[in-house]
Amino acid sequence: MEPEALTSELSQLQLGGAVFVDTVEGVQSMLRQVRDGGVAEVAIDLEGVDLCRSGELCILQLSDGETTWVVDIFTLGEAAFAEGGLRAFMHDPAVLFVGFDGRADADALVYLYSARAASFYDVQIASCIRQDQEQGRRDRFVHGLGRATERFLRNDRDRALALERTKKAGLALFAPERGGSYAVWKQRPLPKALLDYAAADVALLLDMKREWEVFSPVEENKQKALVRIDRAVRSRLPAKGKQMAIKDF
């Protein structure tokens, strides 16, 4: 399970390595590396087709800030969570998972694989609270990862441009409005542009959390995240649609 060769754009994002994991043994090795390293915080994100309880989970990304793993859930399925140990790892309250709006991801994980992060910090909550405080008013809507990373990298033009190029290359393959199809996440081997895109999605989450937790302290954020994820998972409807843009914290 050797790190893939990084593109220059990803190197500028300061990722230590991007590892594609498509075997149960690879998942087990990944989790041993995380645990043996004493990692207390792990960035997480998911990719798939219509990602929610009614869709398909294809990719799960984890990053400890030094290495990013892109786990092939489409190929491994339940084995990644059972024999691989992902379910038990996610249920460990000693590990803080750091993500951006975990509602749709949790909806997919709970209904498709009976898995859920026991401890979750939502960078979207922190970013929105930061914005509200800086502008002196409460915005009625949440904003996405793109705006949050743009704000985070406002003084680092090189990294911002590298991220923009990486995201554009990936979106061109899977975003329908750009001529792509979400089904490409099921293509194997996974196109390099999608591997880079997936790795980039978690590249900055830990740094963003550390910078913005002054606006949204960990325990306070975890409670807000728990409430909004519970609401999404317990809803009779999948966690998707225009209502997801309304601020719910």
Language model feature labels by segment:
Residues M1-V42, L46, E220, A232, ...:
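N-terminal accessory regions of nucleic-acid-interacting proteins
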Residues E41-S54, D105:
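Short acidic, Gly/Ser-rich segments with clustered Asp/Glu that frequently serve as metal-coordination loops
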Residues A43, V95-G102:
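Acidic beta-strand-to-loop metal/phosphate-binding motif
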Residues D50-T67:
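A short alpha/beta connector and helix-capping loop motif
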Residues T68-F97:
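Nucleic-acid-processing active sites and adjacent nucleic-acid-binding tracks
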Residues R103-S114, C128:
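Short active-site loop/helix that positions an aromatic residue
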Residues V123-N155:
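Short alpha-helix plus adjacent loop in nuclease-associated cores
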Residues R159-S235:
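Acidic, Mg2+-coordinating catalytic module of metal-dependent nucleases/exonucleases
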